[in-house]
Each structure stands twice: as C-alpha cells, then as structure tokens.
Regions:
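Generic protein-terminus/edge-of-domain signal
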Residues: 1-61, 67
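Basic, amphipathic alpha-helical hairpins
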Residues: 137-143
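Residues in well-ordered beta-strands of folded domains
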Residues: 18, 37, 72, 92, ...
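Residue-level signal for functionally critical sites in structured catalytic/ligand-binding pockets
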Residues: 29-31, 35, 44-47, 69-71, ...
Length: 143
C-alpha cells in the first residue's frame, strides 16, 4: 500500500496548525510537520512507521516529520461490536520553527533528542498532561 504525501495548506502563513479530527478517515500518510495527537474519543490501533500500538481516549502521541502514520478506529475495525468512534485533536508544526543547528545548541539538546525519538513515535499516558494540552489546543485557532 502506498503512502499518501499530505500537504498542509493554510489559509494564512503559519508554522503551526491546530486540526480537529471528528473521526479518523485519512489513509496512511505523512507530512513534513511534526504532529502532537490527542486521542479524545474511542480506541483503536495507531501505526507509526513500522510500529503498531493500541490507543484509547486520553492517550497522547508525538509523531516525527515525514513519518508515515495511520489511526484505525476499533469502530471501523470491528463494525459488529459496540465501539465508540474515535476522534482527536492534532497540533502540527513545521520543522522550521527550530533553529537550523538545533543539535549544536546546548539549551536545545533535550528538544533535539525528543525530535529524534519522534521518528519512531512517542506515546504519553499522563492524564493531567492530556487535560492541560486539550485545554491549550482548544484555545488555538483552527488551522
């Protein structure tokens, strides 16, 4: 199966976008932006690169730049069972927001290593962090 190269087109010039997903319908895709995904409803399987991991409401995923990914909702995978459809909120940001020589700047070492690890996908299971991020996402204008 091919990977959809997704271009994020903005109505205005910005390096960061908040995108609500009332349901997960995109095929396996990738984009240059990093993506912080909050799973706000439902459960299913998340494919990031070559890895597969279950997700559920309250989970947070951080996906690296140009990493193929897909979210498959259990309601779609098992239509005969009574699963709630999945939904999420994504914050996508362009790599250009970081300094060009990020790895050489001591104050950015933690961020540099986090961005490197995001090439494999990072999962966070912190309910307090989820609630804080959800409130912050909702305060950002969409797109």
């Amino acid at each position: 199966m091919g990977i959809l190269e997704r271009k994020i087109i903005h109505e205005r010039t910005t390096l960061c976008s908040h995108i609500p997903y009332p349901q997960f319908v995109l095929p396996r895709h990738k984009h240059v932006e990093y993506e912080l995904m909050l799973f706000t409803r439902g459960s299913g399987k998340q494919f990031v690169g070559e890895g597969v991991l279950d997700y559920q409401q309250g989970d947070i995923a951080f996906i690296g730049s140009n990493v193929p990914h897909l979210h498959l909702c259990n309601a779609k995978l098992n239509p005969t069972m009574d699963f709630e459809p999945s939904a999420g909120e994504a914050l996508q940001f362009h790599p250009m927001i970081f300094p060009f020589n990020l790895e050489e700047i001591p104050d950015y070492q933690f961020i540099y290593h986090l961005l490197q690890k995001s090439q494999y996908g990072i999962r966070f299971y912190d309910k307090e962090l989820f609630e804080e991020l959800k409130q912050r996402f909702l305060s950002i204008n969409v797109y």
